[in-house]
Design a protein with these regions (language model features):
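Solvent-exposed, glycine/polar-rich loop segments of beta-barrel outer-membrane systems
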Residues: 1, 42-50, 82-84, 116-137, ...
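Outer membrane beta-barrel translocator domains of Type V secretion systems
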Residues: 1-157, 274, 278-280, 285, ...
Length: 294
């Protein structure tokens, strides 16, 4: 369950692998909440997920063209699939940057994540009713590179973009606590390579002499190479068997919309929505940003 969740969270290139706060000289913070639902494929049971977390970071220009930044974060998520559930505490560190030359921009970033997982599987069979529990760790690593081109139409700023992202996840082995019905799982690894493209639109509106609002909209499509996670399980010393999880969607449509309020020359407050839709899957998130320029 967690390996599938880790890879699904690592999709969507720049949206997931770097902060959504504007690239600038300053410090910033971001709080977010998201919910997602994955429908059953007829074999594996459907799953729902909710997550809440925050990210903080700092960035700055090292030259006229280059900007580099660092960030860290924490996320708490819950996963539910029928009689199985898990709670996950995730810790994240990462770096990002950009290079701008005339109208062309190259944006890149990556992060490393450590996940502490507590899972529960309820067993109901004849006279047996058990809550099998396990605690184990997982890790994931993600990176992306994106190329964009800014087009100023005077009415709106357009940025067509295309990029590539890669994610790798590793889950440690585990053994549930109930001896009679306990499952054991071997450690497993999986990876996801994705290509994506889309367009961003933005415009700035003056509210007063010192206050303005920047509107942002993005639409995109992503193609994923990874399909279905698999895990080797066994009961006690019995022979192991392979269990397949929910397949990740090959093609995903996503949209973002946001407002950034420039409260002063150095401080901005932003609100953003992000949605992703694919066959049998939908994911929605709300984010709040606070940034202070140097």
């Amino acid at each position: 369950m967690q390996r599938m969740n880790g890879l699904s969270d690592s999709r969507y290139g720049r949206a997931a692998n770097s902060p959504d706060a504007p690239l600038q000289n300053g410090v910033w913070g971001q709080a977010y909440n998201s919910t997602a639902h994955f429908q059953s494929d007829g074999e594996a049971q459907g799953m729902s997920r909710s997550a809440t977390g925050f990210i903080t970071g700092i960035d700055g220009h090292i030259s006229d063209n280059w900007l580099l930044g660092l960030f860290s974060g924490y996320m708490q998520s819950s996963l539910n699939s029928g009689l199985s559930s898990a709670s996950v505490d995730s810790y994240q560190i990462g770096a990002y940057g950009s290079y701008v030359w005339n109208n062309v921009s190259l944006t890149f970033g990556g992060n490393a994540n450590l996940h502490d997982i507590d899972s529960k599987r309820t067993i109901r069979f004849k006279e047996i009713t058990n809550d099998n529990r396990a605690s184990y760790k997982a890790s994931s690593y993600q990176g992306f590179a994106e190329l964009g081109y800014n087009i100023d139409t005077r009415l709106v700023l357009l940025e067509p973009f295309a990029g590539i992202s890669y994610a790798y996840a590793k889950t440690n082995s585990f053994t549930e606590n109930e001896a009679v019905t306990a499952l054991s799982g071997s450690g497993a690894t999986s990876s996801l390579l994705s290509n994506y493209l889309g367009i961003r639109l933005s415009n700035n509106y003056a509210i007063s002499e010192n206050t303005s609002v920047n509107t942002k909209v993005a639409l995109g499509w992503q193609h994923n190479s990874y399909t279905q996670p698999e895990t080797m399980l066994n009961f006690g010393n019995n022979p192991g068997f392979m269990v397949a999880g929910l397949p990740l969607s090959r093609d995903v449509l996503y949209a973002q919309a946001g407002l950034d309020f420039n409260l002063t020359q150095r401080t901005s407050l932003g609100l953003q929505y992000r949605g992703q839709v694919a066959h049998g899957m939908q994911d929605h998130a709300i984010k709040v940003n606070l940034a202070v320029n140097f």
